[in-house]
Amino acid sequence: VAEFLDLVRISSPSRREGRVARRLVSALQALGARVEVDDAGARIGGDTGNVLGKLPGSAAGAPPLLLCAHMDTVVPCETVRPVVEGDVIRTDGTSVLGGDDKAGIAAILEAVRAVREAGIPHGPIDVLFTVCEEQGLLGAKHFDTARLSARRGLVLDCDGVNELITRAPAANSVRVTVHGLEAHAGLCPEQGISAIAVAAEAIAAMRLGRIDGETTANLGVIEGGLATNIVPNRVTVRGETRSRDLASLEAQSRHMRRCFEEAAARHAVTVDGREHRARAEVRIERSYDRLEVAEDASIVRLLRDASARIGRPLATRATGVGCDANVFTGRAGLEVANLACGMRAIHTVHEWVDVKDLVGTAELLVAALAVNAAQTA
């Protein structure tokens, strides 16, 4: 708990995880890990790279296991003042808490410390703390998985407890630039095409929010205009769509594109004998692939055995959010699931965690490391 409180007090927004990274390098070295920091930060414009700690195993022949969490948090996170009320740790209402994902980091460090101090046999452990997860899993995307010894593992990055996320959506980013025509808003507005009005028309016609049981869509940023007395000639819109069903993902992506293109096609003006038409540039790209881990996969069996060892039921479920496991699963033969680690009300200033959940997550990791030690590579 003390370690979690120390971590959340360190500001670490995306691309500025340097302070917490240095703290974690020292913590891993104190546990006996060989620590490397890669160049992901330089490639994405950040102040540090991904932190990888490699701990040797104490059980001969046991397979390596990956434990991963991300260092960055969403904003506001500049001054986090955690409030402890009994077993609950929450924010003071002015910032996020940072349990997403420092709850995962704290659980990993505590579990590794516990097996080392108690002399519990374990296989080699790869501990990976990534950067810029909150900005499209960028740290994981820029991490060279060939540096890992483990072929299976756990990302700790989900709300809830005693749950293993085995299914998560793929996501497409949606970036749109709507071009109109500027004009004086008071003198000759009929000679302009408002890019904001075109975008508004497109958005009004668009299906957003919960599309179906597998699919969501959101437009989260809109920017445009220079002054109130100018008909705006340009507006940009940024959003996303996610789905665990790839056909639905592509259908929603086409729908969003069509709404912008059709709205633009309806707007044209003629000025001094020349026709001007609105135009929508729509760019849709895959942000990350879906997570699909089979119910009989070895990492799922490992967690079920670990849960049984400590007398707790483990549920597997789907989620609507992506994480670093989306990047690692299936890449270079890795098998990675997402273990819930007790974070609650994430991405809000009402975020909180229960100390019992932090402890319980660490206990489950200790059990997983012990069960893994009895297996052979």
Where are these regions (language model features)?
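A non-catalytic alpha/beta surface segment that caps or lines the substrate-entry region
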Residues: 13-60
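Active-site metal-coordination/substrate-binding segment of hydrolases
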Residues: 21, 47-50, 54, 60-124, ...
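Acidic/histidine-rich catalytic neighborhood of metal-dependent amide-processing enzymes
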Residues: 93-169, 211, 217, 228-229, ...
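Acidic-glycine-rich active-site phosphate/pyrophosphate-binding loop
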Residues: 72-87, 165-177, 304-305, 337
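Glycine/charged-rich beta-loop-alpha catalytic/anionic-binding loops adjacent to active sites
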Residues: 83-96, 177-183, 310-311, 343-347
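Metal-dependent amide/peptide-bond hydrolase catalytic core
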Residues: 195-377
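Acidic, glycine-rich active-site loops and adjacent beta-strand->loop/helix elements
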Residues: 41-43, 71-73, 128-136, 158-160, ...
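N-terminal capping segment at the start of a domain
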Residues: 1-15, 286, 344-347
